[in-house]
């Protein structure tokens, strides 16, 4: 991430605090704005999976639930929300596992 000041940008100290609390911290930027996100918890994932038939609602739910700071434009305005939709894939990452029969 560049060192120029963005709308919603927080200090490294705040980011470190979030990392201590949430583990991973993700961000998205557009039009000189930045927002920060954490991974969803199990309850949020469960609810998101129920919204799979409505992708826009699922994206909105995940981003609104997981936004921890920065510029709230990304969760309030549709074009920013859709632009940040690629972030949902990172937030809901799945570990590849091996399955076998014994």
Predicted feature locations:
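Short, surface-exposed, charged amphipathic helix/loop patches that serve as local interaction elements
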Residues: 20-22, 29-102
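Short, basic/low-complexity N-terminal boundary segments at the transition from targeting/disordered tails
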Residues: 1-19
